[in-house]
Amino acid sequence: MEDGVAGPRLGEVAEAVEARAPRRVTLRPFAPFSAAAEGDGGGGGDWSFIDCEMEEVDLQDLPSATIACHLDPRVFVDGLCRAKFESLFRTYDKDTTFQYFKSFKRVRINFSNPLSAADARLRLHKTEFLGKEMKLYFAQTLHIGSSHLAPPNPDKQFLISPPASPPVGWKQVEDATPVINYDLLYAISKLGPGEKYELHAATDTTPSVVVHVCESDQENEEEEEEMERMKRPKPKIIQTRRPEYTPIHLS
């Protein structure tokens, strides 16, 4: 790397992409900063504090997939338009795979290596496809070390009762006192059917706000049924006459 060179230059990134470097990509400065550095006599200017080793980026840390946005809806339903869309990216990597998300109107393009993804991103970003300006963004890379979930931390797995083998520094947890709002209970106890409750007292400019607690419909219906039951006349039971007894020998 030349003296005074310390940031990424877009043109040289494209050259590095075309060269298909096997392991690492070296980022160089943007043109405005490199020109300023050359004007200072090659001393680096404001970029002299950057270590050249920090400019080397491992390819494993670069994304190998891009997300295509602002696409024509025909890409998701028309097979011919879809084949034309895929051919744009297969020129950079023949092993490219595609994932279509119709509801999000986006397509994920998976490349076999990060260099192909960077090459397609540089050349196809903001290009016109089917009358719309297509935009490409790098997909976020995820590095999962293990396919299993990590166990939870053991600091909150103990109950209030002491465990069989308490760890060092473990202490008994005391039950918290229940919180009781006595003001609310007192206000509720004062309420009753048919009584009023003044929420806000009246002032010189505002009226008072009073709440009248009404009886429930079920209680009213029960009272009406009880009143009707009391008003009904009691049924009179008529006693039947006992049949006269006639001896058998007289019949």
UniProtKB/Swiss-Prot annotation:
Pfam families: Calcipressin. One of its GO terms (biological process) is short-term memory. It comes from the Eukaryota. Residues 216-227 have a biased composition (Acidic residues). Keywords: Phosphoprotein. One of its GO terms (molecular function) is protein phosphatase inhibitor activity. Phosphorylation increases its ability to inhibit calcineurin and decreases protein half-life. One of its GO terms (cellular component) is cytoplasm. Highly expressed in heart and skeletal muscle. Also expressed in all other tissues. The modification Phosphoserine is found at S161, S165, S216. Residues 216-251 are annotated as: Disordered. Gene3D superfamilies: 3.30.70.330. Belongs to the RCAN family. Interacts with RAF1 and PPP3R1. Interacts with PPP3CA. Inhibits calcineurin-dependent transcriptional responses by binding to the catalytic domain of calcineurin A. Could play a role during central nervous system development. This is Calcipressin-1. The lineage of its organism: Eukaryota, Metazoa, Chordata, Craniata, Vertebrata.
